[in-house]
Amino acid sequence: MRIAVIATYTHPTRLRIKEPSIMQSSVPELIAGLCPEHAEVEVFNEKEVDIPLDRHWDLVFFSYLHSYYEHTKVLSTLFRQRGMTTVAGGRHATHFPDDVALYFDAVITGEPESNVPALIADFDKGQLQKRYERPSLGPTAIQPYRYELIDFTNNKVRLPGIEASRGCPFRCNFCVLTGHERYRYRPVAQVIDEIQTRMRWNPNYLGLMKDAFIFLDNNLGGSPKYLRELCEALIPLKKTWGCALTFNVLKDASLVNLMAKAGCRYVYTGLESLNPESIKAMNKGQNTLSEVDAVIRRTFSAGILLSFGLIVGSDGDTNEYLEKIPEYLADLQYFSVTFLGIVSPYPETPFFRELQAEDRLLPGTVSRDYDGYTLCHRPKNLHPSEVVDHFHRLCAQLGSLPNIARHYWSKLTLSNLPRYKQTILFAGPEILSIRNPLKNPARRYIAGMDALEDWDTKQMAALGLQPQRIT
């Protein structure tokens, strides 16, 4: 049996651009680890490589985000026309299983560990079902990834990734996890064994990235007690790692120091906003803005690069606040912003339901618009065009070369811990990527006003496919 596992991708500019980076989706390696030993499995990440459309597999699994749906169903339709069986899974497929079933032979609406082996067994017997929604087997069922399938020549800066936990205990109103997943975590011994015995390391750059990896968890700090136990177990391994976690974890100085001792050199946290009204509107009470400066200084002093994501377009945002964001950031000397987006009301979130009830969703939105860069609603205090104008300006300012120079100058000498300076240097391209939305000057970044990618538009017309309309 020949199986392909494909993580699809379309660039937020809607141009045909690849985006190799340190952190990539590891869903293909996860699914591959659930396939039977007799299967010949290939994995593809479209951020790194094109999908070979002339190849043939018996079974093709697709992993995708909401905004990649139109592109993914084009690929599925092309493969099905040539006799291949296609499968879709993920959050979009779980929320829209009936629509997805029109373009794929089977839909997985549950966790992969309980559903992928069952689906493959049914396919082998010629008894494939249309939908697989078996209950979760719990975090102990997470299998080691097929790290040996990662081709580091396609992405020279990529780090291997691992999951220690899933879900998040918080209830931010715009987050796709809210109301759908409880927080759960794997036994620490299981995680450590996978790192020691299964993980494969990036050999590029004269070994500078050897023994470095990323935790792919949505929130590695969902249980501070668990994180402490994990860090204690990581210390003897002498590895270098990064993770994403919520801001509240970083208020604990002893835990931050323990993370650094365990090899943590990079933390990403969704601060989202420096405006108290916006934080309140997001139901993100774990972000205490009065402590931001102290948390930043504490984390960098420990030898950890702290990176933030900011979003604009929230209901608390005003013209005055958005105008002053660069000033606020200048006051936070060591602040690093590596993601800048527009808040997106994903259809399965409380934010979407709130906007729907208030008739504030913009008309003509399609699944492609839910990419974290396109305004899909009318904010309370701003006209849609004002949001986009501020977004463009901030992309240019925060992603500028002078800002990257300040990033290097202010942070390189803050710590002498191993690989700290290396982490600071590798973060430069991340900051520069904030400028990506400016690469397509024709892009409006308002739902319903931008065409799909040229290739997808042509293929959909030829195949008789229509975009999925959300409003």
Annotate each PLM feature.
Residues 99-118, 258-267, 324-340:
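Structural recognition of alpha->loop->beta junctions
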Residues 87, 108, 242-244, 307, ...:
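Structural detector of well-ordered beta-strand residues that form the stable sheet scaffold
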Residues 2-8, 17, 37-43, 123, ...:
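Radical SAM enzyme core and accessory elements
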Residues 1-210:
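Acidic, low-complexity intrinsically disordered segments
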Residues 34-40, 237, 295-306, 332, ...:
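A structural motif corresponding to the C-terminal end of an alpha-helix
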Residues 52, 57-66, 228-234, 300, ...:
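Short, electropositive alpha-helical surface patch
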Residues 144-307, 312-314, 320-322, 327:
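Radical SAM [4Fe-4S] cluster-binding motif and immediate context
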Residues 10-14, 99, 277, 281-282, ...:
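Flexible glycine/acidic-rich beta-alpha junction loops that bind and position SAM and/or redox cofactors
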